[in-house]
Structures are given as structure tokens and as C-alpha cells.
Amino acid sequence: MPIYQLIDELVFPPLDHAEPGGLLAVGGDLSPRRLLLAYSMGIFPWFNADDPILWWSPDPRCVLALSAFYLNRSLSKELRRGRYEVTFDKAFSEVIRACARTPRKEGPGTWITGDMLKAYELLHGLGYAHSVEAWYEGCLVGGLYGVALGGCFFGESMFHCMPNASKVAFATLVRHLAMLGYHLIDCQQSSRHLLSMGATEVPRAEFLQLLQNAGVHPSTLPPKGKFPSR
């Protein structure tokens, strides 16, 4: 299938036009309206520094239904230990930059480019992008960030520089999102770690239905998801 070249108009091609690997379109921009439209349609940007902007909608999609979250014994013990203080939206810029510095298994470099940093910091300022932080003795040692729309949290990246710090941040986020009535977390691509916590791969069509059930519909101004504050 052809790869669509985006133009200035805020539109994306039908998702079933994506390549088998999930690549749907190239180009466009990282403006808030385009990013929000993309997320609300089940699309996300992911590209290297030397690439044009690439837009993806993989099939299958890795998701975590909050009711299916599995807290294993070691992580439960870590949470009870209370070694880390977890906060929300206290250090968004620091978290996304720490994620950008985290080495990738695929090789050197980062997909969180300078343009991506600016785009998500702008989304954060608009109340759509959020961070979760794990602190140890006043130092940021782990965390994650993503986008909250309706009853879905779209996870983007996480980091840690102490054992289990990002896992504690994630588990704490799951608990608070469940209390706020969220339905699911979009994990985008599966990993053994995510699957061990209850995430599963679902067909793209099922994922889109889950988004609708969570109150997320295609829009350049979708409803903001409520987010914990502490």
C-alpha cells in the first residue's frame, strides 16, 4: 500500500491503509491539533531524528485494561516498602528529557527529538500531556509521561535510574486512573514487561472500539482526561 504524504489540512488516511508494520503516513506537523486528532484516531508519531515525521497505527495494538492490571509479589512488596515518593505533573520537562536520554535497545540516538520535546511540553501546558514522577530523597529517579483523553491514557515513554522506580510510578498511575474512572492505557507496542502486568494485544478494530467506549472520538479538540494531582 502507498504511504500517505500529509498536507496542511488536518486529516489522516483510513487506518486500514497502514502498512503491515503499522506505518500509516509521513509528514505534516506536531501541532497540538494534529497530535490530538492523531491520538483520538488511534495514531501516534514515532520517528528518529534524521527521519521525517512518521505516523503509526499498529495492528495488533498493545493495551492494558485497568481491571486486568496484575501486581506481582515483588512489585507489591516494593510499593509497601514505600521507598519512592510518587507525584503527578510536578516535573514534566524533567521526565520527558530523562526519557529522551534513556538508551534504546535498537541502538544509539532517541526518537524524542527536540521538536517532540517542544510539542509535548506544549500539550502539557494545554492540559493534555501528563507526567508521573518517582523520587528518592528528593531526587527524580524514575517516571513516565503520556497523553490523557477521555477515559484513556496513551503511554509514551518511561525511564528509571533506580530499581523498580518506573514500575512503582506506573503501578501508582494505574491505581489512580482506576479511581478516576479510566478504562484503559494504550501501550502502543507490546513487550514482555507489559504483558507480565496484564497488557494484551488486540486487533486494531477492537482497539478503536475500546477508544470509543472510553469516550475518545476523532477530534482536533477531544475531551481532556482527568488526572491525579498530588
Swiss-Prot record:
Transmembrane segments: none
Cysteines engaged in disulfide bonds, as pairs: none
Transferase as UniProt keyword: yes
Protein location: Cytoplasm
Substrates-to-products reaction catalysed: N-terminal L-lysyl-[protein] + L-leucyl-tRNA(Leu) = N-terminal L-leucyl-L-lysyl-[protein] + tRNA(Leu) + H(+); N-terminal L-arginyl-[protein] + L-leucyl-tRNA(Leu) = N-terminal L-leucyl-L-arginyl-[protein] + tRNA(Leu) + H(+); L-phenylalanyl-tRNA(Phe) + an N-terminal L-alpha-aminoacyl-[protein] = an N-terminal L-phenylalanyl-L-alpha-aminoacyl-[protein] + tRNA(Phe)
Any single Gene Ontology cellular-component annotation: cytoplasm
One Gene Ontology term from the biological process aspect of the record: protein catabolic process
Keywords: Acyltransferase, Cytoplasm, Transferase
Domain of life: Bacteria
Keyword Acyltransferase: yes
Broad EC category: transferase
Xref: InterPro entries: Acyl_CoA_acyltransferase, Leu/Phe-tRNA_Trfase, Leu/Phe-tRNA_Trfase_C, Leu/Phe-tRNA_Trfase_N
Pfam families in the cross-refs: Leu_Phe_trans (PF03588)
Gene3D superfamilies xref list: Leucyl/phenylalanyl-tRNA-protein transferase, C-terminal domain, Leucyl/phenylalanyl-tRNA-protein transferase, N-terminal domain
An annotated Gene Ontology molecular function: leucyl-tRNA--protein transferase activity
EC number: 2.3.2.6
Role noted for this protein: Functions in the N-end rule pathway of protein degradation where it conjugates Leu, Phe and, less efficiently, Met from aminoacyl-tRNAs to the N-termini of proteins containing an N-terminal arginine or lysine.
Family: Belongs to the L/F-transferase family.
Protein name per Swiss-Prot or TrEMBL: Leucyl/phenylalanyl-tRNA--protein transferase
